[in-house]
């Protein structure tokens, strides 16, 4: 299980139900990493997508509400059980905060883009501090994505 997100200097990941920035190199990297994989998100993340479903990926939503337009599950346990039964080899959790909180302890790898901004109006934060991440994960690579962002890849220790 992989978690993938971008955050600002304070751990901010969302503003008004959307990404608070538009960094093309980060979006390209997200696409490259998640293409031809299964992606899992919460209902709010699903609703914020400009294109539904994200193309060339199996889209799954975790929601307590009925979601007839997309494969969805109402609990983490049901979701994990079904994906295991389907033989899903790689799962990318793409948001939001509640879904990250439910999967961080199950994650094998993290893909974090650090955005060099202190964004105004952030209302959603990644639910785990970088200090806690560093206790459980080891950074194995770092790539500059232009002037505004740095992509990092972490594996569980």
Could you describe each region identified by the protein language model?
Residues 1-157:
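Enzymes that bind and transform nitrogen-containing heteroaromatic metabolites
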């Amino acid at each position: 299980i992989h978690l993938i997100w971008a955050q600002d200097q304070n751990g901010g990941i969302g503003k008004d139900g959307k990404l608070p920035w538009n960094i093309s190199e980060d979006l390209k990297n997200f696409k490259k990493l998640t293409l031809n994989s299964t992606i899992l998100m919460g209902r709010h993340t699903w609703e914020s997508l400009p294109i539904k479903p994200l193309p060339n990926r199996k889209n799954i939503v975790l929601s307590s509400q009925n979601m007839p337009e997309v494969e969805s599950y109402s609990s983490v346990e049901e979701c994990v059980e079904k994906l295991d039964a389907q033989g899903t080899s790689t799962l990318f959790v793409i948001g939001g905060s509640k879904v990250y909180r439910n999967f961080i302890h199950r994650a094998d790898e993290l893909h974090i883009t650090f955005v060099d901004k202190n964004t105004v109006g952030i209302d959603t934060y990644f639910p785990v501090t970088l200090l806690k991440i560093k206790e459980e994960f080891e950074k194995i690579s770092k790539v500059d994505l232009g002037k505004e962002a740095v992509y990092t890849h972490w594996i569980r220790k």
